[in-house]
Structures are given as structure tokens and as C-alpha cells.
Amino acid sequence: MPENFKNFIAGEWVAPRTGAFFENRNPADWDDLIGCFPRSGPDDVTSAVASAKRGFAQWSQTPAPIRGEVLHRVGDLLVQRKEEIARAMTREMGKVLPETRGDVQEGIDTAHYAHTEGRRLFGRTVPSELRNKWAMSFRRPIGVAGLITPFNFPLAIPTWKMFPALLCGNAVIFKPAEDVPHTAHLLVEILLEAGLPPEVVQLVHGEGSVVGKAMVEHPEVPVVSFTGSTETGSVIGTTCGRMHKRLSLEMGGKNAMIVMDDADLDLALDGVLWGAFGTTGQRCTATSRLVVHERVHDTLVRMLCDRAERLHLGAGLDAKTDVGPLINEAARKKVEYYVGVGRDEGAQVLIGGERPTGKGLERGWFYKPTVLGGVRAGMRVEQ
């Protein structure tokens, strides 16, 4: 039987009030069931907010250097468990081990950096225009921060949001993407092992349209940080603006790499391959457009197709793999759809453009690395 994981609310691992769970499977092998995770509802968010407020009352009174020491211990624990977490992350979301090891390293670096900032939360003194008066400013914690994070950097992005918030004395409610709940579970375990007071962090799994919405709309969550799609971020921005909340948004992009005729083509190509196919192209900063000077166009495209065709497609836990699976069925269908749109508009599929065949690829969300040529300004795939 698969393990039923739980939310972390009010200092305890608890089942969702809905009683519902969803499956978390390896995108490289559908038969590999990692576990079942809570499909939480608004009542779970309400409980998490109440607990986080209690945690905030305690944590905000803890001296910042002491808060920093907790984060230093978090960083040390991440160092100790780096390989374990990287392998769990690759199993859960598919990207290759060198990338997930880098993901954990981002968390380590962020923890150790945040630790040092605990002794640098400086205020300011300001000259006054009035006699016998002086003015000053100092930093104060805000309250409960709601953090909504994506699947593509399951540990790095949560730490970028969470560690500064914790260092500054805030409590956090953490809502990870539905595709990467296990990595989130491991991160919260480490926070607790490092000595973070239990009610300072809450972990609520579930759908963004339910859990994320309830968190964003809750009047006692004054800070929201979101990384994800532009469409969802726009809705969150509207809600937070209406409710006068503090907000951080990091959303999608359509990124171009420009190669001029005096470029080092080998160096440029390294950048293109990493930008386009790293994390299987599933990054807000991924290179989805390549604009090439006409003098070197044919040469660079030929080099690109040759290198891209030699990228090894497979499970991220395999040391030979260069490109892993897409995160889920919807992601693969979206790629297939836009390749079809490009064909219909007159673009040429130079390589890829289809699902792969072969041993080990039939039970995962794999798609061949694809290059479209003959793309003109104004085509949907170019926009």
C-alpha cells in the first residue's frame, strides 16, 4: 500500500479535513507511485492561518541572530541530506541528477546567506529638521506569509521565499505545486529538525485553485509570494491589490537568445542547449526563441540540430541521461499542441516533433528535443 502523507498544521502531521488524497507518480515511470498526498480544502487553510498567527507571536519576538542560527542548522542538514533529497526530487519531477543536486545547493547557499543576514537587519537614522528631535527607522516582521511555489525548482524556489521571510521574523504557510509534494515534505522535516518552532511553518498540500485561492483571499495572510503562470499570477495580483496585501510575483516568459555574426558559435550553442533543454525546457527563463544573424544562421542551425539530436533522453536518475521527461501529461500535450500549431503556420520541424520510442520511454511523459525552423515574426510559436 502506498504511504499516505499528511499536511503539517498546528505543529502536527495531520490528514486533510476533506479526507481526500491525490497520487504522486514518477513522471519517468507511471508505475512508480511515490505516495498519496492531501487534497486539502479551505478549512485546512483556516487552521493553518490560525496556527501560523500563534507561531508568529512567538517567532517575531525571537532575536534575529537566533533566527539566523536556526537557518544555519537548516543549511547544514541540507548538506548532510543533499544526495537523498536530490534523488527524491529527480524521482518526483524528472530533471536529471546534476540539476537536482544544484537545486539542493541553492537551498544550502540561501540558508547560510540568510543566517548571516540575521546580524545585518539594520535600520536607519535620519537627520531631523526640528530641534532636539531625531528620526529612525527599523525593520519589523509583518505577519503570516503565504508561499505558493512551482514544480520546476522544488527546493530552491521555496527556500528563496521561505528563508528570508523566516529570518525576518514572519511565519509561513507553504503550498507547493501538486507535482512535487514529497520534496516539500522533506524540506519541512528539515526545518523542524533544525529547531524551527513548529507553528512557525505550515505545509498545506492541494490544488492551487482551492488551497492557493483560500490562502490568497484570507484576510489574515498579509504577504503573498507566488511563482507560476502569468494567468494565475494576474488573478493573484488583482486579489492582493484589492485587499492591500504585500505581493511578490514571478511569472512566465518568452525568452529569446540572440546570436550575432561575430559570436563564438560553440559557446553560443552551449548556452542554447542549456537554456532550451535544461529542466526539459520547463523554466520561466528557458530559451524558447533563437534569433540568429543571417550570416551564421545556416551554420548554427546545423550545429544545433546535430548536438540536440545527440542528447540522451531518459530517466533523470540514469547517469547517461541529458534530458528527462516533462512533468505530466498536460505538459506533454501542450508541447505537442504548439508543435502542431507551428507546423500549421508553416514552420519546419528540423528535429524531434514527436514522442520517442524505445525501452524505458514508453511509460513516461517523454518528448523528443525539438527544433522548429523557418519561424517568422508573428507566428504563435514565436510570441
PLM feature spans:
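Terminal low-complexity tails and localization/encapsulation signals of metabolic enzymes
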Residues: 1-36, 69, 73, 121-148, ...
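Glycine-rich loop-to-alpha-helix module at the N-terminal edge of alpha/beta enzyme cores
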Residues: 30-121, 132
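Residue-level signal for inorganic ion chemistry
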Residues: 31, 67, 89, 111, ...
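Hydrophobic face of alpha-helices
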Residues: 46-49, 68-75, 79, 86, ...
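Generic non-transmembrane alpha-helical segments
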Residues: 73-81, 186, 190-196, 269-270, ...
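Rossmann-like NAD(P) dinucleotide-binding subdomain of oxidoreductase/dehydrogenase enzymes
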Residues: 123-267, 320
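ALDH superfamily catalytic-core signature
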Residues: 223, 231-380
